[in-house]
From Swiss-Prot:
The gene is IL2RA. Residues 87-109, 186-213 are annotated as: Disordered. Residues 87-98 have a biased composition (Polar residues). It comes from the Eukaryota. This is Interleukin-2 receptor subunit alpha. It comes from Macaca mulatta.
């Protein structure tokens, strides 16, 4: 075998895992009467540039936004732009419907609150800014190590039996999301788990879908600490695996060298 190819394979094998962003194969798990939200997005996360009905992405525009950066600063690359699907009516002024106006105001309010609550994390991007004529639902492509948090929708209360978050992990070469331990029950229904009910802060005056996504500043600090702890643990485990692999290779090389030396000694004795 070519020694250069052997050296390349060896270096590839002992490279510490996690240096390259691995996309998660599936979406985060779904919980009945609950929605999930990412407080910050790891580098490598992609967001589809989706437009609402009657609009389409411009031909020269990128199909997605990408969270990229370095150890000191991360931001979203590319910009999503939507244009009217009807080329003939481009000069016609379209009056937005009341629902669209309400949705736009809600999105702007949500973006402002998120920018105020969020703290910059190394290797993470904030919530992507909204763009004109954006689709109602955002489609993300998360990477390994991403953490999302769950919250019951308006009209339901949370019964916690464990962590209410999910993390995308790499296990045996495959990605999987941990299962969040959250149960949402109607506010009028009796609790089946005494002592496990936890109150939820839901600002009045916001639609159900938007209210369920908001995260308070206090919750964000706690979640940030949990996220940092989990990421440190994941990195430490992967690093230990890499070190163990290096030690194994070193021992193998030493054993092979020893066996080769013994064979040479035996041949020399026979020759003598």
């Amino acid at each position: 075998m070519d020694p250069y190819l052997l050296m390349w394979g060896l270096l590839t094998f002992i490279t510490v895992p996690g240096c390259q962003a691995e996309l998660c194969d599936d979406d985060p798990p779904k919980i009945t009467h609950a929605t999930f939200k990412a407080v910050a997005y790891k580098e490598g996360t992609m967001l589809n540039c989706e437009c609402k009905r009657g609009f389409r992405r411009i031909k020269s525009g990128s199909p997605y936004m990408l969270c990229t950066g370095n150890s000191s600063h991360s931001s979203w690359d590319n910009q999503c732009q939507c244009t009217s699907s009807a080329a003939r009516n481009t000069t016609k002024q379209v009056t937005p419907q009341p629902e669209e106006q309400k949705e736009r105001k809600t999105t702007e309010m949500q973006s402002q609150m998120q920018l105020a609550d969020q703290v910059s994390l190394p290797g993470h991007c904030r919530e992507p800014p909204p763009w004109e004529n954006e689709a109602t639902e955002r489609i993300y492509h998360f990477v390994v190590g991403q953490m999302v948090y769950y919250q019951c929708v308006q009209g339901y209360r949370a019964l916690h039996r464990g962590p209410a978050e999910s993390i995308c992990k790499m296990t045996h070469g495959k990605t999987r999301w941990t299962q969040p331990q959250l149960i949402c029950t109607g506010e009028t229904e009796p609790s089946q788990f005494p002592g496990e009910e936890e109150p939820q802060a839901s600002p009045d005056g916001l639609p159900e879908s938007e209210t369920s996504r908001l995260v308070t500043t206090t919750d964000f600090r706690i979640q940030t600490e949990v996220a940092a702890t989990m990421e440190t643990f994941i990195f430490t485990t992967e690093y230990q695996v890499a070190v163990a692999g290096c030690v194994f290779l070193l021992i193998s090389v030493l054993l092979l060298s020893g066996l080769t030396w013994q064979r040479r000694q035996r041949k020399n004795r026979r020759t003598i």
